[in-house]
């Protein structure tokens, strides 16, 4: 008893995911999106490194060595209290110490343009995150609506099954009084079996859509998952659809894929400047401080550090004369990339228009289908109710009854499908205008 109670409480406490819940969770956990964020972090590091390259570099160095001269016969002579002492030290030590700096003063603005280029790359990485997020949100919305539709389809199929069961029971009663053949009853039984099959198929499709949605959310397949069922009213499906031109004009200004393609053009222009700088001279400066010590010098370490200290400052000018066409090739390739970027902008705008046009056509087409199917369901329901009464009175045969039932079921399913497809495409059109997805 306690186990049953715990199971009941667990089932009742299972979370129902709204569309917003699904989107918010995916934005934090989807692996593809996390990979895009890592690319952005990498681009940020590239930008920081290029900015640091504008500054001088500084390094310190030291070298310590020890040597041994086994055949050395003379050494260092000292006089102490009138006594002459000679010390032969076959082992000796040397040390050098240095501090060096270098700075590229000017290289045709290559360094500064590289900073600008890496800033553009960083912006593009950020836009790529937005592109990935938008794509995931669209897929989530599509799967979410498919799940809503399949839930409704299962409900309609179950209602159809109940009707089939009643018809089958009524057929058995009519058979007993001799007013129906066994062949006609078999058709009613087959209809009931077909409705049961339709339910199984719809439930299988529902499970598949849920699995796809869980995969987008990075939820393991063994975790319980179900969505919140919002009230999708007929008024939502009948709402006004924005014009194709207004959606496209707005999308051109806010969609990250368009902005990203335009940044490709900026990137190619900067690469052109960097390539052209290969024809210009490079001015560099170097400086250094150094000293050295040795055990054979006869003076102490501190004195040697001071005596041997030296400082240096230098400048170098590198003028390119012939580089085996490397610079010319880089310039030409940058020009090719610029032309490619222009074509990519046109292609992205074309793809955007095609996508929006598809959603707009689907929204309008399904809305018209929905309006038509509403009256069709009413008429088919009235027709089937009349057929059912006439069948019970023996005025209609089994074929006419089953035909009427099939027409009603098809009309109900068409109404559901057109309703949810209209709502989905309306939401996607709003999404392309910068609004959040919601049902």
Where are these regions (language model features)?
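Sec/SRP-type N-terminal targeting helices
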Residues: 34-38, 51-52, 91, 105-133, ...
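Short segments within alpha-helical structural elements
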Residues: 194-219, 374-435
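Periplasmic alpha-helical coiled-coil/stalk elements that build and connect Gram-negative outer-membrane
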Residues: 45, 135-250, 362, 366, ...
């Amino acid at each position: 008893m306690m186990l049953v109670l715990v199971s009941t409480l667990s089932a009742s406490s299972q979370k129902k995911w709204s569309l917003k819940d699904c989107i918010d969770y995916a934005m934090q956990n989807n692996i593809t999106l996390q990979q895009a964020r890592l690319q952005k972090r990498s681009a940020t590091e590239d930008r920081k490194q290029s900015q640091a390259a504008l500054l001088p570099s500084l390094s310190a160095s030291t070298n310590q060595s020890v040597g041994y001269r086994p055949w050395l016969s003379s050494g260092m002579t000292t006089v102490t209290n009138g006594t002459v002492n000679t010390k032969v030290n076959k082992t000796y030590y040397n040390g050098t110490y240095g501090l060096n700096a270098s700075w590229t003063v000017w290289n045709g603005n290559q360094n500064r343009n590289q900073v600008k280029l890496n800033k553009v790359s960083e912006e593009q990485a950020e836009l790529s995150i937005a592109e990935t997020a938008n794509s995931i949100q669209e897929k989530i919305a599509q799967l979410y609506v498919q799940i809503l539709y399949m839930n409704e389809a299962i409900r309609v199929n179950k209602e159809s099954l109940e009707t089939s069961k009643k018809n089958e029971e009524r057929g058995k009663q009519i058979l007993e009084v001799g007013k129906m053949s066994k062949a006609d009853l078999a058709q009613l039984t087959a209809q009931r079996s077909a409705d049961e099959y339709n339910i199984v198929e719809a439930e299988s499709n529902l499970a598949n859509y849920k699995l796809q949605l869980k995969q987008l959310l990075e939820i393991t397949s063994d975790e319980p998952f179900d969505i919140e069922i919002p009230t999708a009213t007929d008024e939502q499906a009948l709402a006004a659809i924005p014009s194709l031109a207004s959606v496209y004009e707005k999308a051109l200004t806010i969609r990250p894929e368009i902005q990203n393609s335009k940044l490709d053009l900026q990137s190619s222009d900067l690469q052109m400047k960097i390539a052209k700088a290969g024809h210009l001279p490079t001015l560099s400066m170097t400086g250094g401080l150094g000293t050295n010590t040795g055990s054979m010098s006869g003076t102490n370490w501190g004195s040697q550090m001071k005596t041997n200290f030296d400082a240096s400052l230098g400048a170098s000018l590198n003028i390119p004369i012939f580089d085996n066409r490397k610079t010319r090739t880089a310039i030409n390739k940058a020009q090719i990339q610029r032309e490619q970027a222009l074509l990519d902008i046109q292609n992205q705008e074309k793809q955007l228009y095609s996508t929006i046009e598809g959603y707009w056509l689907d929204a309008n087409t399904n809305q018209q289908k929905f309006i038509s199917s509403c009256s069709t369901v009413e008429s088919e329901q009235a027709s089937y109710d009349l057929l059912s009464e006439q069948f019970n009175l023996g005025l209609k045969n089994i074929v006419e009854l089953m035909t009427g039932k099939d027409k009603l079921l098809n009309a109900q399913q068409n109404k559901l499908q057109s309703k949810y497809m209209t709502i989905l495409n309306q939401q996607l059109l709003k999404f392309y205008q910068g609004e959040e997805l919601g049902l």
